[in-house]
């Protein structure tokens, strides 16, 4: 209910450098606890400027990622509440209207993330199969608000940084101008967040299932 309420009622729209929407209080206290406590491997990472380390890192980082799937859903009950919000017709209609994309027959992908010292993301575009990208932040370690996502214009000039505020988030549609990344910055302990996508490829969670 928290994510649904945030998308429907606690949302602000922006157009620079591309259309995006910021969310306030999208997570319940229980969901914050679940995201904070889920075990995410601290094995060495390549930190090649991609999340999966598929540009010179042999994809090693991708093998350490934690997605909400059927085989671990019983351990992540509050993540399942988010799935229900994301399947809600009011939510789907609201997101579709904003991003101007048809979500019919799409799937939901949810990832639990703990970015640690050395992590960064080069400016990139999402693959077209990602119809929408949403990031939800928790800042329980009082990290710098500058650790939010960086948005760029077509000249790769940094235009805006979404603040890394506790219990906040944003979303946007994939496109040919939605350049985003994370500059090399100091992460003192952890940058915990959750990435949510509506995608065209199959996952455990079809919106109609």
Task: State what each model feature region is.
Residues 2-3, 8-98:
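Non-heme Fe(II)/2-oxoglutarate
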Residues 71, 75-78, 84, 91-209:
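Catalytic core of non-heme Fe(II) oxygenases with the double-stranded beta-helix
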């Amino acid at each position: 209910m928290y994510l649904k309420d945030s998308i429907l009622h606690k949302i602000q729209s922006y157009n620079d450098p591309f259309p995006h929407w910021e969310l306030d209080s999208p997570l319940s206290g229980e969901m914050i606890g679940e995201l904070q406590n889920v075990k995410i491997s601290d094995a060495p990472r390549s930190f090649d400027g991609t999340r999966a380390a598929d540009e010179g890192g042999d994809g090693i980082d991708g093998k350490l990622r934690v997605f909400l799937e059927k085989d671990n859903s019983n351990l992540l009950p509050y993540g399942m509440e988010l799935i229900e919000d994301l399947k809600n017709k009011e939510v789907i209609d609201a997101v579709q209207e904003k991003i101007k994309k048809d979500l019919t027959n799409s799937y939901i992908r949810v990832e639990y993330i703990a970015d640690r010292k050395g992590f960064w993301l080069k400016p990139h575009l999402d693959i077209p199969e990602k119809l929408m990208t949403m990031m939800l932040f928790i800042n329980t370690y009082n990290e710098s608000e500058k650790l939010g996502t960086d948005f760029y214009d077509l000249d790769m000039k940094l235009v805006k940084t979404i603040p890394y505020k506790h219990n906040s988030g944003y979303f946007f549609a994939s496109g040919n101008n939605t350049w985003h990344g994370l500059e090399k910055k100091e992460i003192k302990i952890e940058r915990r967040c959750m990435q949510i996508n509506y995608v065209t490829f199959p996952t455990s969670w079809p919106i109609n299932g």
